[in-house]
Amino acid sequence: MDCKIVNNAGIDLRDMEQHIHGMYRHFDKQIGFKKPPVMVFDSDPGNATKTLGKTAYYDPQTFEVHVYVDGRHPKDMLRSIAHELIHHQQNLEGRLDVGGYHGEGYYLKNKGLQKLEQEAMSRGNELMREYEDQLKLKKENKMSIKDWKNKE
């Protein structure tokens, strides 16, 4: 099952959409989501001008992954999605409600949230790399077979 995409930003997602769904399917195969999230693409030009502005967030109440799109490379947006998909799984497992401080600088002040963030950073990047490498290997294999057939 693919995830729903909401394009509030009005950007052209044709090239990216196959990777959003493909990456989601790869993560689902590895993790086993009980419910798909909704991918929401948002525009915030003011945020885009900030060097350390927001890139994405996960809303555990609505199961939505929000991605800010302004001025970003598609692969960077996919990295944000990968990270937030891990938070989605953490939410489905009931692990996001750790209590403690949730305000500015929570990563430094809340060890429970810090551990969840570290998991999202490492596991999200790991699964995205697997997805990317599998696509590249599949493409190489198709090209090798084509070359082999052309030589006969």
Please describe what each predicted stretch is:
Residues 2, 29-35, 95-97, 131-139:
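Surface-exposed helix-capping loop/turn segments at secondary-structure junctions
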Residues 2-61:
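Auxiliary, metal-adjacent structural segments of Zn-dependent hydrolase domains
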Residues 75-79, 91-122:
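Post-HEXXH active-site segment of zinc metalloproteases
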